[in-house]
């Protein structure tokens, strides 16, 4: 090769392995408004300095590989590389550190949660230099937020569609989740809706099984909600689960739901995948369907304190990918959820602007600009005695979903729905009158049960039921 045609890469190239921190640990770096910022909980292997571990995360999730390569000279690594710009120890934990990494926006495809996660968490979690790694939070810059459609409709549009204001919405997951015929399933839906619930729900694993094919379920559920609407004068919905084995089949189910005129469909966004979810969210906006999101499989990813991805990151990703509701934990029921941490990501779902607040696990200030909000869904092991706490914790912009807490009523589904609706209305009225739900909640429920035999029966059945376990997800 003559000197005239010699490439930059062949000048000064030296093969071999060098420490990541020499290139990717840059404590002097000042982050840009356009950077995606990540907070990783890093547990290095014994003998690995935290700076090297943090730099390795930055390298392996951006431009780096295990050895020096001559093609590095063909591009500007300083422009494209991730940078570990700050490391701090985790209080009370041995050999755990929070490593802050900044990624240039050019590393990511516009409007693609799939590509964002493939880059940031795709390969680095199996890295040998780390004993464990957890992505605690992401700061999504407004320049990147604006490339996403986000939720199909958002909180205000949903309330306008349903004509329901000033209170949380009420739902119920139909049980048993598997085994019912389509007609019996539709009957259970009708009983719940006519009793006063706003929504009923397919469970996450109800797709199209031999005992109940999806088309039969959609037809009987549509009949049930139209009948309940006619009797109550309220708009009703059933989350018809469109999740399927292929994107084409998923879209076929969503199209059929739209043809039936129902207001809402459902998707399991983690098992279904972000590409499928974003496609469905776009269809729902274009065709006036609300989209309920179930987070099946989330605990596989987020339950371990030192490894995986925290749910606040999955919640942010869902808001970008698209969904009008998402399950968020209850704080008081049978499923995981510590109060301050749960409310931290509930605010990340609902609000336009969220300040950094480490006491709630929020590592970065997040500005969602014009992206619509998502309603958090409290579901799992809750019943009428929990209603005051749920109303106080989650406020009006939420969905409170009682499965067993409706269908387990001794008199049947409709009385179970009546009990929940009466309890909710009593709590909202008491709150509006200035009463303290936290201290007077049980008294409020007892007062309401005096004029509602359905609520009185529910109070008697569930008076001793508690789920008292220490939360795993702590700061």
Curated annotation (Swiss-Prot):
Binding note for cofactor: Binds 1 Mg(2+) ion per subunit.
GO molecular function terms listed in the Swiss-Prot or TrEMBL record: magnesium ion binding; monooxygenase activity; ribulose-bisphosphate carboxylase activity
Keyword Nuclease: no
Residues in coiled coil: none
Modified sites of kind N6,N6,N6-trimethyllysine: 14
Acetylation found in the keyword field: yes
Active-site residues from the entry: 175 (proton acceptor), 294 (proton acceptor)
Modification N-acetylproline occurs at: 3
Record-listed Mg(2+) binding positions: 201, 203-204
Keywords: Acetylation, Calvin cycle, Carbon dioxide fixation, Chloroplast, Disulfide bond, Lyase, Magnesium, Metal-binding, Methylation, Monooxygenase, Oxidoreductase, Photorespiration, Photosynthesis, Plastid
Database matches in InterPro entries: RuBisCO, RuBisCo_large_chain_AS, RuBisCO_lsu_C, RuBisCO_lsu_C_sf, RuBisCO_lsu_fd_N, RuBisCO_lsu_N_sf, RuBisCO_lsuI
Subcellular location: Plastid, Chloroplast
PTM description: The disulfide bond which can form in the large chain dimeric partners within the hexadecamer appears to be associated with oxidative stress and protein turnover.
Site positions (Transition state stabilizer): 334
Enzyme class of the recorded protein, top EC level: lyase
Residue positions where N6-carboxylysine is found in the record: 201
EC number(s) given by UniProt: 4.1.1.39
Top-level lineage group: Eukaryota
Propeptide intervals in chain numbering: 1-2
Catalytic activity: 2 (2R)-3-phosphoglycerate + 2 H(+) = D-ribulose 1,5-bisphosphate + CO2 + H2O; D-ribulose 1,5-bisphosphate + O2 = 2-phosphoglycolate + (2R)-3-phosphoglycerate + 2 H(+)
Function statement: RuBisCO catalyzes two reactions: the carboxylation of D-ribulose 1,5-bisphosphate, the primary event in carbon dioxide fixation, as well as the oxidative fragmentation of the pentose substrate in the photorespiration process. Both reactions occur simultaneously and in competition at the same active site.
Subunit structure: Heterohexadecamer of 8 large chains and 8 small chains; disulfide-linked. The disulfide link is formed within the large subunit homodimers.
Family designation: Belongs to the RuBisCO large chain family. Type I subfamily.
Miscellaneous notes: The basic functional RuBisCO is composed of a large chain homodimer in a 'head-to-tail' conformation. In form I RuBisCO this homodimer is arranged in a barrel-like tetramer with the small subunits forming a tetrameric 'cap' on each end of the 'barrel'.
Record-given protein name: Ribulose bisphosphate carboxylase large chain
Species of provenance: Magnolia macrophylla (Bigleaf magnolia)
Organism ancestry: Eukaryota, Viridiplantae, Streptophyta, Embryophyta, Tracheophyta
